[in-house]
Amino acid sequence: MANSLLSSNFMGSQIFVSPPTPKTTKYFHFHSKRKSLIPQSILNKKPNSDNSKNIPSKAALAALLFSSITPHAYALDNTTPTVPTPRVIQAEAANPTTSNPFSQNIILNAPKPQAQTNPELPEVSQWRYSEFLNAVKKGKVERVRFSKDGSALQLTAVDGRRATVTVPNDPDLIDILAMNGVDISVSEGDSAGNGLFNLIGNLFPFIAFAGLFYLFQRSQGGPGGPGGLGGPMDFGRSKSKFQEVPETGVTFADVAGADQAKLELQEVVDFLKNPDKYTALGAKIPKGCLLVGPPGTGKTLLARAVAGEAGVPFFSCAASEFVELFVGVGASRVRDLFEKAKSKAPCIVFIDEIDAVGRQRGAGMGGGNDEREQTINQLLTEMDGFSGNSGVIVLAATNRPDVLDSALLRPGRFDRQVTVDRPDVAGRIKILQVHSRGKALTKDVDFEKIARRTPGYTGADLQNLMNEAAILAARRELKEISKDEISDALERIIAGPEKKNAVVSDEKKKLVAYHEAGHALVGALMPEYDPVAKISIIPRGQAGGLTFFAPSEERLESGLYSRSYLENQMAVALGERVAEEVIFGQDNVTTGASNDFMQVSRVARQMVERLGFSKKIGQVAIGGGGGNPFLGQQMSTQKDYSMATADVVDAEVRELVERAYERATEIITTHIDILHKLAQLLIEKETVDGEEFMSLFIDGKAELYISWVSKEED
């Protein structure tokens, strides 16, 4: 930085200037149109003997200087290292027009000469590697001292300053230092800081291990948690919930609609309470009882009822809790569970969703290890192995009995398989009564009608129905739940919520009305078909309208469907397209019947390939028998029939669909007046119930359709 005292604006013939100090020199600012900077070295310089006559006293000079110093003066540097003698610099003649009147013929006192700082060297304590190399090549570095690991060095410059440098992996560095005459040494020991870092590095594995141990301990509930040990050892401990005196709050009185299953389980409870009654006759206590049934039928609820009724220690767990992160954990947890159970015998062990570990052992495809296999092998051994499990009854629940291993289902392990099926009408009435407790109902609520409208519903479905009805009543700010809320809740569960805010044009409303009228008209006039329960053109979910049929209770429970029923079902599905063609013409049909076509094709192909309802194919099942590929039962899918047979199947399917289409067309064209009345009623009211719909048929004197088979016989 240029010194303003050396510029042409400074007045005087000769000025003694000291070399710059190693640190940044602070300056005073003068109030003048052009500011001049005066270093402290000049302020402290002793006056020259030749010019001492023209210099005022020190007090006068100080008063003169400080009178022109701004209030923002900075402190002067006090560092005074010894330096060579000052040199004389000739100042250029100043322009008298721009000179400062306070600077003419003044010689300032300077302190003792300070050490001269090499301007080519950085003034920081940490140098960059490039700066270090430049200084070495210019001969500015006297010696270097490397750290023990060679990652850093400390240098001493020729002017005595010291700095540190981070050293990269440079193989030529030693040669460069030696060529430039730099003294090289290596530190014999680490500094305190490096020693601390090395100590931490040596202790890090132990700290990490202690941290992991602490995390395992916390995850397992701390010392004395599950299993009694805490920490990593709990991985092999069972996570089952134990109740010495079960308090589930559920008894057999709370279970409705599963009378046969309750009877089977009540015997198990009685066996635990009164074993002498059975042992006197030579009977042995069952070792296991498997609850099988669709989801939501109350299998877990029955197990809770057994726990509440038995009065013996009760262990409960989910099968998915056995298999976890490490290999062998599943088998270890099974052993631990049965060890605890045997110590509390007689007792009950309940395993929910046992198919998670009880699946059939696979064919070994893939070459990997399946942890479930070790788990199920241990479970088989504990239930009926060499040592047995006297006094321990195992209850298990699953909705996939088809995938369970056959060794698990044999007598001696699961002696009883209790089927918990969907409830019938009487069972649904009892379930509705149970789930209506605590709910305010109006007098028009008829549980029998609700039960008949909900065939195939499980206990969980009915519980959800009553809960949705209560929510609807609260939304409508009602004090009681009426049949309307229950009906709306049922439709909401089946098809989704109403789209009340949807803007529907008159043309679309008319189209949807004829769609649903076509379904209802064909279904009502087909013999032995399900009666119409309700018709609606209010959009719900993805559907623009819905026609509700009430399925036969007997048909649903038995699962037996006649050929005429399936043909009627296809005709009902095609009624929408037929009505659209008759009313709007062939050129104006829409894609609204696409889902109906998929349903019709599926039913027709099942009739030909699986059900033996084709004269040309006969009583032959076409296609593979199915199976689970992951169990090794069916490793590839291949056709077991020829191309000629496939052509025959396609022709038979097409014939069944065309026959259903002709039947639907005949019904709609014959009763076109009823179709118009029903569509107009739907446009006006948007919803028509079954009773109002049947009144149209009575007024129109509609007749049931005579089946195709009857015509052929005539």
Curated annotation (Swiss-Prot):
Residues forming the catalytic site: E516
Compartments in which it is found: Plastid, Chloroplast membrane
GO biological process, one term: proteolysis
Taxonomy, superkingdom: Eukaryota
Transcription regulation recorded as keyword: no
Alphabetized UniProt keyword annotations: ATP-binding, Cell cycle, Cell division, Chloroplast, Hydrolase, Membrane, Metal-binding, Metalloprotease, Nucleotide-binding, Plastid, Protease, Transit peptide, Transmembrane, Transmembrane helix, Zinc
Cofactor binding note from Swiss-Prot or TrEMBL: Binds 1 zinc ion per subunit.
Positions of ATP binding: G293, P294, P295, G296, T297, G298, K299, T300
InterPro entries tied to this protein: AAA+_ATPase, AAA_lid_3, ATPase_AAA_core, ATPase_AAA_CS, FtsH, P-loop_NTPase, Peptidase_M41, Peptidase_M41-like
CDD domains attached to this UniProt entry: RecA-like_FtsH
Gene Ontology terms: cellular component: chloroplast membrane; chloroplast thylakoid membrane
S-S bonds: none
Protein topology in the membrane: Multi-pass membrane protein
Cofactor(s) recorded in Swiss-Prot or TrEMBL: Zn(2+)
Residue intervals passing through the bilayer: 55-75, 196-216
Keyword Cell cycle: yes
Enzyme Commission number(s) of this protein: 3.4.24.-
Family assignment from sequence similarity: In the N-terminal section; belongs to the AAA ATPase family. In the C-terminal section; belongs to the peptidase M41 family.
HAMAP family in the record: FtsH
Function according to Swiss-Prot or TrEMBL: Seems to act as an ATP-dependent zinc metallopeptidase.
PANTHER family: ATP-DEPENDENT ZINC METALLOPROTEASE FTSH, CHLOROPLASTIC, METALLOPROTEASE M41 FTSH
UniProt protein name: ATP-dependent zinc metalloprotease FTSH, chloroplastic
Organism: Nicotiana tabacum (Common tobacco)
Designated gene of the protein: FTSH
